[in-house]
Amino acid sequence: MSTTTLTRREQRAKAQHFIDTLEGTAFPNSKRIYVTGSQHDIRVPMREIQLSPTLIGGSKDNPQFEENEAVPVYDTSGPYGDPEVAINVQQGLAKLRQPWIDARNDSEELDDRSSAYTRERLADDGLDDLRFTGLLTPKRAKAGKRVTQLHYARQGIVTPEMEFIAIRENMGRERIRSEVLRHQHPGMNFGARLPENITPEFVRDEVAAGRAIIPANINHPESEPMIIGRNFLVKVNANIGNSAVTSSIEEEVEKLVWSTRWGADTVMDLSTGRYIHETREWILRNSPVPIGTVPIYQALEKVNGIAEDLTWEAFRDTLLEQAEQGVDYFTIHAGVLLRYVPMTAKRLTGIVSRGGSIMAKWCLSHHKENFLFEHFREICEICSAYDVSLSLGDGLRPGSIQDANDEAQFSELHTLGELTNIAWEYDVQVMIEGPGHVPMHMIQRNMTEELESCHEAPFYTLGPLTTDIAPGYDHFTSGIGAAMIGWFGCAMLCYVTPKEHLGLPNKEDVKQGLITYKIAAHAADLAKGHPGAQIRDNAMSKARFEFRWEDQFNLALDPFTARAYHDETLPQESGKVAHFCSMCGPKFCSMKISQEVRDYAAAQAIEVGMADMSENFRAKGGEIYLKREEA
């Protein structure tokens, strides 16, 4: 762990340098490939890990090798993972989905911004130096139209986004021919419907049923389509965002790019400091993944941080502002009802959700029902006009394992199920947020309750943390719970970093959180039996058994750390071709011994086989040619 502490000025300068020198970068011995769809502009990016050949015999002077197939893997890095793409953060990413959005002819450009706050910010010349220069002219659904992926799916339409996703979810496994790599254990999927091959029609049907969502605001055309659902790969979200005391626009853009490099499927901008609007614009215009927000945070800023002063009008203006910038999903704490707040009084840790506590305080101050609940249909009308998905927030989630699975938590969950049905009336896509802090033996109930109460809408959880005793290691305590609930059916896992409960994460913390959660998500995919999930594991195991060290590094989720740990003990280049590692040494390496045993067994089998044939030959009289009936 680094002990170097940078000043705020140094941190900003470092982030600015990162942005200024940013270019498409591939992982070691990987290359970007594109798998095309039925139309020319559906080009699905993947990373292909190139592997070295296996030594199968021959002599020292004339060795014989067998080629190993390249392994394609899911890639969230967008253009940042393609060395052939010129990156310019000042201009933003190419608008990948714009032709698809325009071709549907159900949306129109706005003459002016719908949000009074946005108009005010745009009129402020003092913000020119902070503002993203290539502002997008926002679009909205035409009168009487709905532009959501759920609406299209219910009409039986397979959109380009759906075809893109089908190709992406199959992870290029059709390219793999090796039976060794294709071998996979059957999973235990707890009632999930995992097909052998994911088709565009399957994607459409899952979205139409509400079991999956495609977060894809029509004002975020830069995003690459992805899906969140129980019957697809488990996804991982990363949180970034500035605060009133730390972090800048440059640092948040850097964290965005960094997050997508290390596997974030979506990113939530939880900014609460100054320049929230400007920071979000920079993030959206440079994000290849969906962006989520918690609009109540910004609405609170607009009333100077006083929860009691929040109004529906201020919140509505914030929704319009963010929808027209391109936010793909909103976390809305509409299930924190006035009558549920007293249920938290006897909790050890009360209400730990920031959004939940804001709404609880507002309800108690005014002794009125949550205005997000009261105006929920209006929220849905806004979302359906831009295709903003709803992430129904768990404002009453447990903040300690003592409070897990209590009355307040599940009462709110049942209300979220009722709100899900309302959102679906407006063709608005919905996922449900979950805990939190839950011991291992109580995790599965969270999944079963959610499936039943919320009609199989996708579940999105923060961990859960399985113990409360490990500040500084909560990425690990929560990774355990994340792997379990992902196996049980959770669709997306919100990462936890080592700084959880302690401070705002920096770049290294973001990486640590993401790697931990990519492990959890992948472990869940293996346990569920997602088609093709085991290919990379098989390739790694084969490389490990054959002492192909470079391939082991390159197949790892974090090749750089794997290489660094190996080189701490065996830094010489010869260590990367050695048939042992530093753990056991050359004489006690189990895999080297296993290879020797295998070779010996094969030789013995040949020798025994020859002896058997010799005995049989003598038993037949030693004649070279036998009569037909004796043969």
UniProtKB/Swiss-Prot annotation:
**Which Gene3D superfamilies does the UniProt entry name for this protein?**
6.10.250.620, Radical SAM ThiC family, central domain
Entry annotated with the keyword S-adenosyl-L-methionine? yes
- Recorded GO terms, molecular function? 4 iron, 4 sulfur cluster binding; carbon-carbon lyase activity; zinc ion binding
Its GO biological process annotations read: thiamine biosynthetic process; thiamine diphosphate biosynthetic process
Q: Which family does it belong to?
A: Belongs to the ThiC family.
Job of this protein: Catalyzes the synthesis of the hydroxymethylpyrimidine phosphate (HMP-P) moiety of thiamine from aminoimidazole ribotide (AIR) in a radical S-adenosyl-L-methionine (SAM)-dependent reaction.
Q: What is this protein called?
A: Phosphomethylpyrimidine synthase
Species of origin: Salmonella typhi
